[in-house]
Amino acid sequence: MPFDGSSKEASKLGWKIPWKDAVVLSLDAETGSVRWKGKRGESRVGHVTPILVDDGSQIVTAGGDRVQGFDVKTGERVWSIYSQGEGVTPSPVVGGGLIFTSSGFEAPTTRAIRLGGKGDITKSHIEWEQTKGVSALASLLYVAPHVYSITRDNILHCMEASSGEIVWIHRLEGVHSASPVFADGRIYVLSEDGVTLVLRPGDKYDEIASNNLGETCLASMAVSKGGFYIRSAEHLYGISAATAK
């Protein structure tokens, strides 16, 4: 691991810091021309998809050691929070005036961050932190008043969104890489074996149904216009009420 002083890995002479010039890039959708480049600064490796918050005025991205908010028009870094971790994969989610993030390896932690800060807001805008039930791969899911996470041990956790307190846990069968999704009042959890669990959200584990595609599924399912889109290792499935008839 390249060394920048924030990792516990030993330094090695001559190793470069590949994220030194890392940016958040905004492109014109029609022409592909660069609109702006927002500097990430001391933020190590991350694999997250950025999200829009604050009525679309900010882009929030999480990387190793940092969660950051950028002005969507100018690329200016508006705020930053220290969040130790390497190889961050879960994308941030937003709900109830909070941004929920999971850090990567080294110090796994789920954090809730209040909107509206400027500068380094590590000491002022973290609403709560939880070191149990931290998702390492699948993104969190917010369904008021709860936040749901799936750990590397394939355990589904339900937490109070306002406090981070764990409401219930349930060990899932199989391995889970895909993020859970919410649609039409139900939570859908897809395993690598191609099994989708349909859950009723709430203060207890409530499984309604289970469906098996019988194929390997690593990607998260997408939901659009009343249909589900699932990419397996072999096929792309479109599932809706119309196709079920």
What are these regions (language model features)?
Residues 18-32, 112-115:
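Beta-propeller blade signature
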Residues 110-121, 161-162, 198-204, 240-245:
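Short loop/turn segments immediately following beta-strands, especially the blade-tip
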Residues 22-25, 66-68, 109-111, 155-157, ...:
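A short loop-to-beta-strand structural motif that recurs across blades of beta-propeller domains
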Residues 2-21, 35-56, 62-64, 80-95, ...:
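Extracytoplasmic beta-rich repeat domains
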Residues 2-6, 64, 104-106, 115, ...:
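Short loop/turn segments immediately following the C-termini of beta-strands
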Residues 108-110, 132-201:
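Loop/turn-rich, solvent-exposed surfaces of beta-rich toroidal or solenoidal domains
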